[in-house]
């Protein structure tokens, strides 16, 4: 998704905070809300905040909203974090590769398996790579990911956006809801400071417009966009 946002960005450099123990003064109201105290993670747009710190900061995010929007979900479902429609393992693997390659140039962390997954040494090699922080993909998954990566990099608007000197990637955003006094959070894939564009990179099993449109609603990406809309408009 590429959307134009209106935000005067003041960035907070949080690259030195790499573990949750670096921010153990976060004050969270476990029962009534999701408030991050003034001595914890600051409200604003963070550059370099680790994914661990972002995920451990208890605040309302898009996943919570997507789960809450489904009337069949109880609070137990929401707390367990299983309200989302499950993404197939293969689709998730492709998405991880595309995200890492396009936004972070980390293609080297993914390898292609040339045999079948039924071979005994597939799992053994998968575990070996996991210990090194790498991921093993099947030949079909790897080739599908390469096709998606090439499509993004060959897109003129995306090429302009990714290469722009004012584009900042992997931002963590925390804001306070003025009505309900709750902390909201979002982790944006990339934001262009100069032009006010926000990008969230999504992969889909098919690029056919009708299939992609259905997937957007099936996986609650429309609600995720609405969550970002609250942040920035």
Residue ranges and their predicted role:
Residues 164-233:
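Mg2+/Mn2+-dependent nuclease catalytic core
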Residues 2-185:
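Metal-dependent nuclease catalytic cores that hydrolyze phosphodiester bonds in DNA/RNA
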